[in-house]
Design a protein with these regions (language model features):
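Conserved ABC ATPase "signature" C-loop
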Residues: 130-131
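Catalytic Walker B motif of ABC-type/P-loop ATPase nucleotide-binding domains
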Residues: 76-79
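ABC ATPase "signature
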Residues: 136-137, 145, 215
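A short, proline-enriched helix->beta-strand linker immediately N-terminal to the Walker B motif
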Residues: 70-74
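Conserved ABC ATPase "signature" region
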Residues: 18, 22, 29-47
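Conserved ABC ATPase signature
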Residues: 51-55, 59
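Short coil-to-helix segment of the ABC ATPase nucleotide-binding domain corresponding to the Q-loop/switch region
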Residues: 11-18
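The conserved cystathionine-beta-synthase
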Residues: 178-209, 216-233
Length: 233
């Protein structure tokens, strides 16, 4: 999938999606049936007979995504697929990407020059300088422990509370007296910080089964959110 979409202007949505299948020698009707499944997957029902010029930029990119998935690749490669979109449509497509990844569970290589986009979409991020990888790690570890000064420049202004999950900053369970408040380890810090900061004691961090897997003191939230930010004063 590329930022310019690369759709064939004389073919409809359905024909564009079916095209790579037909190139592989799949029978026309089978390719059309598969293409229609992809149309539904990316939410373009009712637009399968439209031409690219009749679609918005976001819709065109959905066609590109559907076409790339129709051939069932082992590795899904996306080269700056959303960079040509305006901010609102770009966010919509990022959310759509996450939905598809959750549904399909594919290995994805996603190239972007937008660090915030990488943090939102990536399970592991490789930051490169002059063709050499400076750091390859999870988003949380890159934000909390940048390996080089070059990487640190990327992370200085990152709003940590919007990126990090509770599990990224929690402590191991201990025998301390805890607050009555419990928070999920999968919560983004921003979503629960206000509740945690009203507590005097550490809160319990729980997993999907309601089991306590860690603790978190309110002071850790303050340190995490403000401790690593660049001082502009």
């Amino acid at each position: 999938v590329f930022q310019s979409f690369a759709l064939l202007p004389h073919k409809t949505v359905l024909e564009n999606i079916a095209f790579p299948l037909q190139i592989k020698g799949i029978k026309t009707q089978d390719s059309i049936n598969k293409a229609m499944d992809m149309v539904k997957l990316v939410g373009l029902d009712g637009r399968e007979n439209y031409f690219p010029r009749e679609l918005s930029g976001g819709q065109q990119q959905r066609v590109g995504i559907a076409r790339s998935l129709a051939v069932e690749p082992d590795i899904w490669f996306l080269d700056e697929p959303f960079s040509a979109l305006d901010p609102l449509i770009r966010k919509e497509m990022q959310d759509e990407f996450l939905r598809l990844q959750e549904k399909l569970q594919k290995t994805i290589m996603f190239i972007t020059h937008d660090f915030d986009e990488a943090l939102k979409l990536g399970g592991r991020i490789a930051i490169m300088k002059d063709g050499i990888i400076e750091q390859l790690d999870t988003p949380a570890k890159i934000v909390l422990n940048p390996a080089t000064e070059y990487v640190k420049k990327f992370t200085e202004e990152v709003p940590r509370e919007k990126v990090l999950k509770i599990e990224d900053v929690m402590e191991k369970p201990n025998n301390e007296n805890l607050s009555d408040l419990k928070v999920s380890k999968n919560e983004i810090i921003e979503n629960v910080a206000e509740k945690i900061l009203t507590q005097e004691k550490s809160v319990a961090v729980i997993d999907e089964n309601n089991k306590i897997v860690g603790t978190l003191h309110p002071s850790k939230i303050i340190h995490t959110v403000f401790g690593g930010r660049k001082n502009n004063s």
